[in-house]
Amino acid sequence: MLLHGRGGPYSINVNRGCTLVSRTNPSAACNAGSLSKRHAMWGQYWADHGYVALLPDSFGSRGKAHGFGRFTHDDPDRTDVNEKTVRPLDAAGALSWLRSQKEINGDRIFLQGWSNGGSTALNVMQRQGAATSGYRAALVFYPGCGPAALLAQTIKSDAPITMLLGSDDEEVSPDRCRDVASRSVAAGSKIDVVVYPGATHDFDDPGRGRQSNPANSAALQDAMVRAIAAIDGLKD
């Protein structure tokens, strides 16, 4: 299950003007056909490896399909789509829905989140704690790890977490995330942290802007190897 970041799930070319999300209304530019390159790429990646990818739209369903720009965390308009108390409920609803689908193995459902969605994923893992009926694991890309983003600065989760960070992230602090991970591991959680030298925020965005940085390109290629290894490596 995929959790988009603060920009929302749609292409930046259309999302700024989106007030409506619809599959059937031609005036709605934001729909499954206008996902960002990153979300489309990862959805196809999981399909190619035999997994179903579900991408809930936390923002469009609440009239905020346009998403939010950089450094807007304190914007009051984000309160009702926040990553601590609102978006984890979206993840819980998605888990319940996936388990109702006959073609889905309900014991092998995983989380992948980016930035704000990565923070959401960490909060989901904190909320479910030692529960055996929750998500099996989480792949977390460059999350915000400060107190404003996380429910706790020590995450207690029995499910494994893989955290992928860029050393040159210009939006969030990789050092803060490493500190959170270190405390969490000391408390018994299973968190693997990878910091990519020279990589920035959004290092896995396949667009030319991000991939023109060789460090981002190398990070993306490594992340795609690690992602399937982390998930396939879990025992049923």
Please name every model-derived segment.
Residues 131-145:
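A conserved short beta-strand
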